[in-house]
Amino acid sequence: MAARVLMAPRRLKPFNRLQVILQHLKTCKHTDSAADVLLQKQGGAGIITLNRPKVLNALSFKMIQQIYPQIKAWEQDPETFLIIIKGTGEKAFCAGGDVRAIADAGKAGDTMTRDYFREEYRLDNAIGTCKKPYVALIDGITMGGGVGLSVHGHFRVATEKTVFAMPETAIGLFPDVGGGYFLPRLSGKIGHLLALTGFRLKGRDVLKAGIATHFVESGKLPELEKDLIALKSPSKENIADLLNSYHMQTKIDQEKEFVLDEHMERINSIFSANSMEEIVQKLKQDGSPFATKQLEAINKMSPTSLKLTLRQLREGATMSLQDVFTMEYRLSQACMRGHDFYEGVRAVLIDKDQSPRWKPAALEEVSDEFVDNCFKPLGNNDLKL
């Protein structure tokens, strides 16, 4: 009897090992190179690879559904010490959410107009609250949904190829994915400029704006990734040290002045205005080439989106990340009920005539009452994180 008791654990060991292997295969099953997202474990690192290079790694609903549970599983796994996210191809980390699919769903009355935003914000919140160090390699175009997959993580590594923007007001949306949280927390009124005009930041300027935490040469990323994977049971500090060493070795544009430096006083003054109408007026009064260019950009945007965005940033400046996602979900559903999102997608992505017919067509026609209604709670339909 005693022998049996002693032997039992030995018999169970191979079975336990098999269970672990099967569980590992379950959690890393999306490794087919044809899959839209690859989820793999290498050493102590969980690696997420966005794998839709032909559409600039646009984030589909299916990808969101795969990434969220994997991040949660790795967060609980004692053998996973960090998470790395990257994009396939040479052009983009992730150019944004799959807005065309969302627009099609909205026209068809499909629930995806609710499901997509709910699950995307849950994923972005999981990244923002992840207990494991999270490293986003934002090489190439990083916009919209791609910003949500990166900006809330511990480490964001930009390269000379990085192009950052939040261009949502051009398609009748607003800078979501937690934009209401991180944008007003950037230096001065940089976040307001980015949100309202869709201004693009490139290369080292993404670091200087406070969006990236590190800057590394694009060609060095495979080596950096290899070194990250090789770290043995790393702490957040160990990972930071490695990233810092690569950052310090990168000399590209090191002496170049931040693209917005010479305009900061102007940006802070103009974008501190209390209303969109006042911002437009200040841009007109300024008359500088920089102000004129921003005015031209704003004049192309959805007036409704501009007013929602300005209020979103003002409210979000004092909110928790979770409260911002709740607010943004309400705004997303207001946009799904409206006109401008579908018109913006038509003009920019479908017909590509770049001539959206916004309704209302002027800022003055977007009432405070309408804006207030967009921020109202949705009762049982509110976002639950």
Curated annotation (Swiss-Prot):
Q: Which reaction does it catalyse?
A: 3-hydroxy-2-methylpropanoyl-CoA + H2O = 3-hydroxy-2-methylpropanoate + CoA + H(+)
Task: Look up the record and name the pathway of this protein.
Answer: Amino-acid degradation; L-valine degradation
Xref: Gene3D superfamilies: 2-enoyl-CoA Hydratase, Chain A, domain 1
Ranges that cross the membrane: none
A GO molecular function assigned to this protein is:
3-hydroxyisobutyryl-CoA hydrolase activity
Q: Where is it localised?
A: Mitochondrion
The residues the record assigns to binding substrate are 120, 145, 168, 176
Whether Transit peptide counts among this entry's keywords is: yes
Which keywords does UniProt give here?
Branched-chain amino acid catabolism, Hydrolase, Mitochondrion, Transit peptide
**Its Enzyme Commission number?**
3.1.2.4
Entry's InterPro entries?
Answer: ClpP/crotonase-like_dom_sf (IPR029045), ECH_dom (IPR045004), HIBYL-CoA-H (IPR032259)
Hydrolase is among the record's keywords: yes
Reading the lineage from the top rank, the first entry is Eukaryota
Q: What is its main location?
A: mitochondrion
Write out the GO cellular component annotations: mitochondrion
UniProt-listed GO biological process terms: valine catabolic process
What does the sequence similarity comment in the record state about its family?
Answer: Belongs to the enoyl-CoA hydratase/isomerase family.
- Describe the function of this protein: Hydrolyzes 3-hydroxyisobutyryl-CoA (HIBYL-CoA), a saline catabolite. Has high activity toward isobutyryl-CoA. Could be an isobutyryl-CoA dehydrogenase that functions in valine catabolism. Also hydrolyzes 3-hydroxypropanoyl-CoA.
Xref: NCBIfam families: PRK05617.1
Q: What is the name of this protein? A: 3-hydroxyisobutyryl-CoA hydrolase, mitochondrial
Its source organism is Gallus gallus
By which gene is this protein encoded? Answer: HIBCH
